[in-house]
Amino acid sequence: MLSIRNFTYLLFLTLGLTVCGTPLAAQLGSSSGAVTGAVLDPSGAVVANATVEIHNPVSGFIRSTPTDSSGKFSFNNVPFNPYHLSVTAAGFASYAQDVDVRSSVPLSVEISLQVAGSTTTVTVESGTDLLETETSAHTDVDRALFDKLPLESQSSSVSSLVTLASPGVVADSNGLFHGLGDHAENSFSVDGQPITDQQSKVFSNQIPVDSIQSLEVVSGAPPAEFGDKTSLVIKVTTRSGLGQKQPTGSLTTSYGSFGTVTSDANLALGSDHWGNFISASGMNTGRFLDPPEFQVMHSKGNEENLFDRMDFQPSVADSVHLNLGYTRSWFQTPNSFDAQFANQDQRAQIQTYNVAPTWSHLFSPTTLLTVGAFLRHDNFGYFPSANPFADLPETLSQSRQLTNAGLRTDLSYVKGMHNLKAGVTFEHTLLTENFSFGVTDPGLNAVCLNGNGTPDTNPTPTDPAQCTGTLQPNPGFVPALLAIDRTRGGTNFPFHGHGDIRQLAMYVQDAITKGNWTFNLGVRGDLYRGLSRDAQIQPRLGLAYKVNPSNTVLRLSYARVMETPFNENLVFASQTTNDPVISGLFGANSNAAIRPGARNEFHAGFQQAFAKFLVVDADYMWKYTHNGYDFSTLLNTPIFFPIAWHNSKIDGASVRVSMPEHHGLTAFVLMGHVNARFFPPQVGGLGTDLGAGGLPFRIDHDQKFQQTTHLQYQPWKSGPWIGFNWRYDSGLVAGAVPFASDTTTPVDLTGLTADQQMQAGLFCGNVFPTLSSPLTTCAPSQYGSTRISLPAPGAESDDHNPPRIAPRHLFDLSVGDDNLFRGDKYKWSLRATAINLSNKVALYNFLSTFSGTHFVTPRTLTAELGFHF
């Protein structure tokens, strides 16, 4: 059998010979195509200076260009989608047709105009450009549409954009989102570069939203070219300067609540043969991360971004494209009242750089070869307080690095009914994990208990035999943790780990169009060699049928997916119990290294267009996974690590209703519902007590219903505009809150601190906790919460009726004018944005196993001034 090493050498050799044997190349991305052609008059003569426009009314993409002296036109960097193409020229009748961009192979059209007044007309089928005869559900969003969306966070704008624009996506804290019932099983494909690691701002730095031209969010069965993490595949097409003969750009600055200041600069310039787009931005804010209190304490942060895309096209057949990126973020860990009183001062810094060159060669009008390489590096540092005893209940320092390097190549062939693509991707990921932590709370692992059952914080006893008088031995005492108990003379526990992960993927897929039918046939093979080993063959199948009389598309799809383990702290999660401290923390029977999961997923859906005014896209999915992934934490520290459950069953519906621009009004409505059930036992990662009873449970990213409504109105093209969002979330699972087991037994609340009780909004009758007076017990009939939906006494079920975060309605508003002084070449813009307009006090989560407690953003006001040229 061919090893990964030998295959890689062979692959590099083959690609090298290919490069040497063909002309040098330049710009056709794996996530975009090109539309080229010529405009002729009835005699066959060229028509110069005709205006050619392509437009997708659903995504908002629109672009126009004049024909040159030879009547030719070209649109580069066009996202995969159907488009309405129109041509106008003086003295000629208007022309229109629909074109479908589905491959990186350029689409060539030849247009013959009729003389004005001719009886010959061109007709276009009503509603055609609203529909896509595609087998997988997806959402397309162009910059023209999302530029006016009120986005919540400058430091995680991409997450906010995906959450607000895609159905089936559940919002979580700190830029995290859950796609279709899974925990962060999302991947990005940036101009064809795969990024499958978490992009939450506590793990990594996201690409800047200024760099994005368009998004396609695939929520249906993934095509064969995508693997690893596929609940959502977010295909990003970045902005380009190719063909931009007149330099364009912008300078913007903003100021808002919490002292937030941002500055952004963008520039695009180029010619027919080269182009450059560069973006630089910076932000400083008093609320970088979502805090555990509605009141913001110790949450300052800043971020700097630099993105550069360079394109070079020396010939019609060749193109080269290079993406460069660097982002640095520094931020404080927000404090709770408990941490603030202790003067806790924990901070973190993340540095990310990315280099991704791509070369494309067009062998013929039907065949395109693309070769790409990529190198992405994350360097994460976590820093404790200067006084370690200010960090409660543990003190922690961490240095974590992730380097992902790889090579990808694909061959696209488009002819007749076939749209064929085959490719190979090799990735090598290096993990380095260094951290140390020590216990700083004398009550966390107390040797003795007082007579009333509370922990004895006296540091002197180090053996249960020393518990004398009114003291009694603590049955929960773990002797192995004495070595890291700083309050009893211990020292920090050090961990140093390294991981080496190699992955090889090969795929072939063919989208076959025959009449009103589309068939998607594909197969993917993955070879995973990391801390565990696996190999899987994964068929991908889909079909779609367009019902012309009713403007309806019906679709079915199936995918087998090999899910690879999360890389964040994977080395630590794969430790055995040879170390007494790890054994003391997680038990003597911790699990083996996490293996890749195996998933079968099924989708059924439809699209329905109503003339040119409305399109409804609905999808229902069923996902069955062996080795279902989630995350756990090291005590109460920000060291998160992956775990695996025996299996999971997830099903749910996603709906998007889109209204393209009509008399200045644009709107869309997103709706989603999911059931996310996980089944013990735990089969991978360090131990946890969740699901210890052997019964299924709802994971904490299960949510019954969420919806987003966006309205955008601009009465005339150059006038002011308004954008409005309404977001409703029914609430994530909140399993850590106490509940009434029956109608008579008082609820024991001593497991929560007074601060935690206040965060949860708990009350007992008319009594609410204060920082100095926590609740201890409460009769079931008097017990309740203002921020968490508690099951009725005796009705709690981890599977069917768990506690949940209370439902919330959030409203956002933006108003602006993109051309204040009605300039032509130079324009000034002004906009004002309000996030959480009603200042709703609500939780994202409460004592989540993965992320802890976080509140949604309070009312945030921002004003932005921009200069555009």
Task: Label each residue range with its predicted role.
Residues 255-284, 294-331, 347-369, 539, ...:
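Transmembrane beta-barrel wall of Gram-negative outer-membrane proteins
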